[in-house]
Amino acid sequence: MTNKHGTLSIDSDNLFPIIKKWLYSDHDIFYRELISNGCDAITKLKKLDMIGEYTLPADYKAKIQVIVNPEEKTLKFIDNGLGMTAEEVEEYINQVAFSGATDFVEKYKDKSDADQIIGHFGLGFYSAFMVADEVTIDTLSYKEGATAVHWASDGGTEFDMSDGTKEGVGTEITLFLNEDCLEFANEYRAREVIEKYCSFMPTEIYLSKANAPEEYETIDKEDKLDTDTVVEEIHEEAKTEEKENENGEKEVVEVSPAKDKLKIVKRPVPLNDTQPLWTKSPSECTDEDYKAFYRKVFMDYKEPLFWIHLNMDYPFNLKGILYFPKINTEYDSIEGTIKLYNNQVFIADNIKEVIPEFLMHLKGVIDCPDLPLNVSRSALQNDGFVKKISEYITKKVADKLIGMCKTEKEAYEKYWDDISPFIKYGCLKDTKFCDKMNDYILFKDINDKYQTLPELLVPVEDEKKETDDSKADDAATEESKTDDAAEEKEPERSTIYYVTDKVQQGQYIKMFKEQNMNAVILDHNIDTSFITQLEQRNEHYQFKRIDADVTDALKSDDTADLTEETTTLSDLFKKTLNNDKLTVKVESLKDADVASILTLSEQGRRMQDMMKMYAAGGMGGMDPNMFAADQTLTLNANNALVKYLFENKDGEHASMFAEQLYDLAMLSNQPLSADAMSKFVKRSNEIMLLLTK
């Protein structure tokens, strides 16, 4: 061909400066773009071989080579794919690739940082000019009679094409790096970037340093490959030792046989895994395979709890593995990492437009070749196809969890404490996920047993039925009067009691256990929001903290009138505590050891907790105490101390005992303030001194 000098486009003067400016923090994507192009060329050549339009050499081995040369400030990308003719260079490099880069810029220029093209995908060959002052291409097409082509451009508006000297089929791209980007000619930096973007590309990628000294390794002679370069043959004599036999005589024994070995030029090792675990059938993978892959990809040496292997071909192609990581404490970060791939090419982490938000707390990889990539984030949000992908992933996660609950209940319970925050967060964020998981959410009770919501409600309903049956005779006489009223009355909600602190609420737990009553443990930050949502979605039950009221089951059957005691002690406590808003009741409780119980209204306490959470999160503006929960102090008429206080209400120490009973009740509910605790300790000492007199 004759030498050709041409112009890329009359509008190209500002193209490369714009690309450099916008992608300043992501210059390294040129590695991904150029290696991806090489992979595509190799894949196409293999397809031509499969359909009989080209015959690959018998010793053909697909590979991409990356050669760094810090001395010459160059970087080479070499593939043995299908190569290009002069006409194809003209078409694909000067027109199609350039047009693609121009389209990329057009899409970028009106986008905010939050709405950029995901992974900056689509820039292609011209991404090289982000780091290079000059780029050359040397290529030879697979087509019979094709001649080598050389192409060069300095990143401006002009290019030169001429006959080349390349001998093997494929393409070699050379980047002459600019002074600001010499880091990319560093072998360690190159390795880092290739492993970031290309760890699982389907073609083997080899990295080497130009003019590096030869490295060698020693192998057994029988392990020699045809591709090995032998430097030296080595014969190792058999190793022997003198040992004493069973007769006590010494003899020479062969410890290891003679070996023939070879010193060879060190075999190159690819940087990537061309068949990552997610591309395989789940039946081909062992537990150790999944764990090893997790350690390799996420550098997390705590074993994952379990995983989900996604494998779908219709109506879209999607493969991947999602891991449930182990979280040691509530305060551990539960931020996960979901890596998105396209045909084994890394695109980006945590693309919330594709991956449901609540799944971001997991760790995993998802490969979806059908995903539209050269679009903005906002376009993805409104893409019906992408929504189907998101819904499919959510469904598979729910199916896995439900399957475990049904068939591996013991394992499900074992993992529950770790996965419950994730599942509850998912229920808060995704209605469909919540609908599927509703009956498979576990609640750990005060007896350390795990139950689902339906299982929890059965005893509650049975208890309610017993109470109803015991009153059946009395109710029958009133049946005709109450039928109409019952129809109008809203159905009564079953109450599920819960504990937020087993130590703090220990007195209440003891009372519940003595009466064979149960309560569940809800001690995570997310639980308040979660149970509120459950109540909103279901009118048949409600949650109450164990200290929200004194349930009838804790009261004795004594029907004595306690009006006088209530009035007397209420006046005493309100006056002593200087708290007119405090409600004081006197009840006959079954446990005579309990003197006083402080209960807080469920609604008021939840509002107070929410205000505290907002304040802790920096969302100030409201005083958390403005929604102070209504307090009720219940005094036990069967307790000796309460009886004494009633009988000696005007006594010298009545106020001291009243304050002490209140603080003791408060301690079973929540920590005392510093000032209140100081007074409590001082008062306790005074009471003990009284006992010594």
Regions found by a protein language model. Name each.
Residues 1-185, 192, 199, 215-222, ...:
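GHKL (Bergerat-fold) ATPase N-terminal catalytic module, capturing the glycine-rich phosphate-binding loop
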Residues 117, 135-158, 178-181, 188-693:
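GHKL/Bergerat-fold ATPase module in large chromosome/replication-associated machines
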